[in-house]
Amino acid sequence: MRNAKGFTLIELLIVIAIIAILAAVLIPNLLAARKRANDTVVTAYLNDAVKFQEMYQIDNNSYTSNQAALISLGLKSTPANVTFSIVSASANSYCMIAGHSGGTVWFAATPDKGVYKTNTAVTSSQPESCP
């Protein structure tokens, strides 16, 4: 009998099957983690925008519907792939909405509720008011 070196076809098929099973389990988890990370980018930006809205309100006795006014106070520009808008603003209230194209849902921010998740999927159009 010869001294065989290397792997048999069966051994290689078993290794390929194990790799396929691991990929089937891990890939969906990685995609979900990416969506959660994208949502975190949105909530962090909205939290910053809330702080700058409060700063603006202290100086002007009213909230602003102009993102440029918040940027002039120090708010960073909108992150890549994030849609952000100040839907409404008055002396006592504001409504800001944001979502990431690779995220799960739209997020909103108001003085009463702070930053919160809406029930509207990011794949649908942006809400026109804070729910």
UniProtKB/Swiss-Prot annotation:
Localization terms from the record: Cell inner membrane; Cell outer membrane; Periplasm
Prosequence residues removed at maturation: 1-6
Residues recorded with modification N-methylphenylalanine: 7
Top-level taxonomic group: Bacteria
Induction trigger: By growth in minimal medium or low temperature leading to a significant increase in pilA4 transcripts.
Keyword Kinase applies: no
Keywords assigned: Cell inner membrane, Cell membrane, Cell outer membrane, Disulfide bond, Glycoprotein, Membrane, Methylation, Periplasm, Transmembrane, Transmembrane helix
Phenotype on disruption: Deletion mutants show defect in both DNA transformation and twitching motility.
Alphabetized Gene3D superfamilies for the sequence: Glycoprotein, Type 4 Pilin (3.30.700.10)
Residue intervals passing through the bilayer: 7-27
SUPFAM superfamilies: Pili subunits
Summary of subunit composition and partner proteins: Interacts with PilQ.
Reported function: Plays an essential role in the assembly of two types of T4P pili: a wide and a narrow that participate in natural transformation and twitching motility. Major component of the wide pilus that is essential for natural transformation working as a DNA translocator structure that spans the inner and outer membranes. In addition, participates in the assembly of the narrow pilus composed of the PilA5 subunit that is required for twitching motility.
Name of the protein in question: Type IV wide pilus major component PilA4
Species name: Thermus thermophilus (strain ATCC BAA-163 / DSM 7039 / HB27)
